[in-house]
């Protein structure tokens, strides 16, 4: 695979290999055949980051070869959304001959939505001043004149300049309902929007007919919490990153959802609160004991669940686990399978043509 060519003719073969690999990894815990969810074969990534290489009067996007670490010039990137590809061309054209904007520019980050909005961040090894702002505003206006719905941000050490805003609002059709999700620059968002829709719809399907409340750890901008709210009486969700919590609160209001409560705390802290080990001021006014959480949802980082959280989630009759790293999922299942069995298993091809797999399991108490 090269940056400017995707082996689309190999898509089905690479997906089949992932199915076999996941089944093999899951064999100690389940003999289920995974439900398989396919990605678009190109233009599936809604965000991308590129270093900028200065070559005399020219400059261009580059990425680094993972094996050799050599730099590769990238003028188009078919894995990224069509809007990112349009912006890559337009940004280089707008910056190349502008001394203020190109000087000490070392990276450009792109974040886009299916609703055709974009935030583009320009990263510099220099101080940004009023002259930079004026030139950046002129570039933004020129991009908008090309019908590109874009917001620009300048970043340097201890500096962030937003020309308008640092977020965009995604609109996703999820099981017959449009969901609005505010996505903040430099915060985690699901990279493959088409796959995200399928993940949300699968999670809705496996939690149909649920009783009681839902607890979610690591909720981000509320991506899963808000979509799943319709299947539960109430949802209690935790998140540590301030921008994500703020986005989640906005998304609750934008989607007119009244049964979701977001708490800003780490999963480890929440475990302590639930077990009565510590009291937290952030939980004042929230009666944890009033929640009847029959289901817990976890979408942990690549490192998986820590041992204390493993023990905590085992107390719930149903565990819905989305994993971006099946190796740590299987490590967690060594513990979780002592008390729970795998009822549903799904493979989400979040990153085609790579070894990465995203998967989902529903576990029920034995």
From Swiss-Prot:
Enzyme class (EC, first level): transferase
EC number: 2.1.1.-, 2.1.1.35
A biological process from GO: tRNA methylation
Catalytic activity line of the entry: uridine(54) in tRNA + S-adenosyl-L-methionine = 5-methyluridine(54) in tRNA + S-adenosyl-L-homocysteine + H(+); uridine(341) in tmRNA + S-adenosyl-L-methionine = 5-methyluridine(341) in tmRNA + S-adenosyl-L-homocysteine + H(+)
Residues annotated for S-adenosyl-L-methionine binding in this entry: 190, 218, 223, 239, 299
A GO term for molecular function: tRNA binding
Entry keyword set: Methyltransferase, S-adenosyl-L-methionine, Transferase, tRNA processing
Active-site residues (renumbered): 324, 358
Top-rank taxon: Bacteria
Keyword Magnesium annotated: no
InterPro entries: MeTrfase_TrmA_AS, MeTrfase_TrmA_CS, SAM-dependent_MTases_sf, TrmA_MeTrfase, U5_MeTrfase_fam
Matching SUPFAM superfamilies: S-adenosyl-L-methionine-dependent methyltransferases
Gene3D superfamilies, A to Z: 2.40.50.1070, Vaccinia Virus protein VP39
Record GO cellular component, one term: cytosol
NCBIfam families: trmA_only
Stated family: Belongs to the class I-like SAM-binding methyltransferase superfamily. RNA M5U methyltransferase family. TrmA subfamily.
Purpose of the protein: Dual-specificity methyltransferase that catalyzes the formation of 5-methyluridine at position 54 (m5U54) in all tRNAs, and that of position 341 (m5U341) in tmRNA (transfer-mRNA).
Protein name according to UniProt: tRNA/tmRNA (uracil-C(5))-methyltransferase
Species whose genome carries this gene: Escherichia coli O127:H6 (strain E2348/69 / EPEC)
Record gene name: trmA
């Amino acid at each position: 695979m090269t940056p400017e060519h995707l082996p689309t003719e190999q898509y089905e073969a690479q997906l089949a290999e992932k199915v076999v690999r996941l089944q093999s990894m899951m064999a100690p815990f389940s003999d289920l055949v995974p439900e398989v969810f396919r990605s678009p074969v190109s233009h599936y990534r809604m965000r991308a980051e590129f270093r900028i290489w200065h070559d005399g009067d020219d400059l261009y996007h580059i990425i680094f070869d993972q094996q050799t670490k050599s730099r590769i010039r990238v003028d188009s990137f078919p894995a990224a959304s069509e809007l990112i590809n349009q912006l890559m061309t337009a940004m280089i054209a707008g910056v190349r001959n502008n001394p203020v904007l190109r000087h000490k520019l070392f990276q450009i980050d792109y974040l886009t939505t299916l609703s055709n909005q974009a935030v583009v961040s320009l990263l510099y090894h220099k101080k940004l001043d009023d002259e930079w702002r004026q030139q950046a505003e002129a570039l933004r206006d020129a991009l908008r004149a090309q019908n590109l719905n874009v917001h620009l941000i300048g970043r340097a050490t201890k500096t962030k300049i937003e020309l308008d805003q640092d977020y965009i609002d995604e609109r996703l059709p999820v099981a017959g309902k449009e969901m609005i999700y505010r996505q903040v620059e430099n915060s985690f968002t699901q990279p493959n929007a088409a796959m995200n829709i399928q993940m949300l719809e699968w999670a809705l399907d496996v939690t149909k007919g649920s009783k009681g409340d839902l607890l979610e750890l690591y909720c981000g901008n509320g991506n899963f919490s808000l979509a799943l709210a319709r299947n539960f009486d109430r949802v209690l969700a935790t998140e540590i990153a301030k921008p994500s919590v703020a986005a989640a609160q906005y998304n609750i209001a934008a989607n007119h959802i009244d049964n979701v409560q977001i708490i800003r705390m780490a999963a480890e802290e929440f475990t302590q609160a639930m077990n009565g080990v510590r009291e937290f001021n952030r939980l004042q006014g929230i009666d944890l004991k009033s929640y009847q959480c029959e289901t817990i949802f976890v979408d942990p980082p690549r490192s998986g669940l820590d041992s204390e959280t493993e023990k905590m989630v085992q107390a719930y009759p149903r565990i819905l686990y989305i994993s971006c790293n099946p190796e740590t999922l299987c490590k967690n299942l060594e513990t979780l399978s002592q008390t729970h069995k795998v009822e549903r298993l799904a493979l989400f091809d979040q990153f085609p043509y790579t070894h990465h797999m995203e998967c989902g399991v529903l576990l029920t108490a034995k």
